[in-house]
């Protein structure tokens, strides 16, 4: 080991902590004093904004004296005005005007605009309130006639449907007494329907028991002997019987001719396409019109049978107590012979035979 290194090592002295602190901190920071450290110890020291810093250094980069003397104010964010109060809440609170909250630092032009808007809103609100009050006064002073256009018609039609017409050939006093009770039931139903026309009220009317019949005269002839079936009935069943008959009667009746006309009202093009299977007139002349008679008759008979079945069902639901009417409706019914599946099968078979005939004609011509 050289002697120089040993000499330098022996010359090194131990450094105290104060010496390390003074050597670590630069001299320029120590010369600033304790105020510099107090400012840094503060939690939120106030810093200059960019505008203020530029304002302080303006003389360095601006040449004209006017710009140097002019002071630039920082741009503040505009405060948005709150939305206007709803008219319903305004009327409930009783405030006649709308309050618009804005910034306190508005210019005169902005204030004038706000006042102009408020005046316009006041005029609109006052005009709308005046028109609504005037219209309400007119409606209150006007005497409207009672609504009789639709309700009276429905009530009249329902009362007509409730009417029970006497059947010919029965003129007994018991029938007249039941007719009187039915008339009383109709009157009570009319007065009840005048108040309300809902379905629940109609059900209540049909379920009400009829009032007792008033005898026509004290000198009425004795009643004829009743048949065995009628003798087995109890008086309670006799009272409930008119109500059941009223509930079973349909309100609308259509004849067979009306139903058949409605079913036969179809377009001519559609009917021709279905009856003649979409063939051209030239092909129909070549094949012969007599081949289409069977298919047309099947289709027409099917339409007529469907219409007659609907009409017979309506007649069957009219009156279950009159045996004569049920017999007539049973005799008027047309028996349902051909089903829809069988008719379709016949049409498909017929079309297939026409196709085979056309192919055979082509082969014969060749």
Swiss-Prot record:
One of its GO terms (cellular component) is mitochondrion. It comes from the Eukaryota. Residues 322-331 have a biased composition (Basic and acidic residues). Residues 127-152, 163-182, 216-252, 313-333 are annotated as: Disordered. It is found in: Cytoplasm; Cytoplasm, Cytoskeleton, Microtubule organizing center, Centrosome. InterPro entries: FAM110, FAM110_C, FAM110_N. Keywords: Cytoplasm, Cytoskeleton, Phosphoprotein. The modification Phosphoserine is found at residues 234, 297. Pfam families: FAM110_C, FAM110_N. Belongs to the FAM110 family. This is Protein FAM110B.
């Amino acid at each position: 080991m050289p002697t120089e290194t040993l000499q330098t090592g022996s010359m090194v002295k131990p450094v105290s902590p104060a010496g390390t602190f003074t050597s670590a901190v630069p001299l320029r920071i120590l010369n600033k004093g304790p105020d510099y450290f107090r400012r840094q110890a503060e939690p939120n020291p106030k810093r200059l904004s960019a505008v203020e810093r530029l304002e302080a250094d303006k003389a360095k980069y601006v040449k004209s004296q006017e710009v140097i003397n002019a002071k630039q104010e920082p741009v503040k964010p505009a405060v948005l005005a709150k939305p206007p109060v709803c008219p319903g809440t305004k009327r409930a609170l009783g405030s006649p005007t709308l309050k618009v909250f804005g910034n306190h630092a508005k210019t005169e032009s902005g204030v004038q605009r706000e006042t102009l808007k408020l005046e316009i809103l006041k005029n609109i609100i006052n005009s709308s309130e005046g028109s609504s009050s005037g219209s309400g006064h007119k409606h209150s002073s006007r005497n409207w006639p009672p609504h009789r256009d639709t309700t009276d018609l429905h009530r009249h039609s329902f009362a007509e449907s409730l009417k029970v017409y006497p059947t010919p050939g029965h003129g007994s006093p018991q029938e007249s007494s039941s007719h009187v009770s039915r008339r009383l039931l109709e009157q009570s139903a009319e007065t009840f329907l005048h108040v309300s026309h809902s379905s629940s009220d109609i059900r209540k009317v049909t379920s009400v028991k009829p009032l007792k019949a008033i005898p026509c005269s004290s000198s009425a002839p004795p009643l004829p002997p009743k048949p065995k079936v009628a003798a087995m009935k109890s008086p309670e069943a006799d009272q409930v019987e008119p109500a059941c008959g009223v509930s079973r009667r349909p309100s609308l009746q259509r004849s067979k001719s009306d139903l058949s006309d409605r079913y036969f009202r179809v377009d001519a093009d559609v009917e021709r396409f279905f009856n003649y299977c979409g063939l051209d007139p030239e092909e129909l002349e070549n094949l012969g019109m007599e081949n289409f008679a069977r298919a047309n008759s099947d289709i027409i008979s099917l339409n007529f049978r469907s219409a007659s079945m609907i009409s017979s069902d309506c007649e069957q639901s009219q009156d279950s107590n009159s045996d004569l009417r049920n017999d007539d409706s049973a005799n008027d019914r047309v028996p349902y012979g051909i089903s829809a599946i069988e008719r379709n099968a016949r049409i498909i078979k017929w079309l297939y035979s026409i196709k085979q005939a056309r192919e055979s004609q082509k082969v014969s011509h060749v």
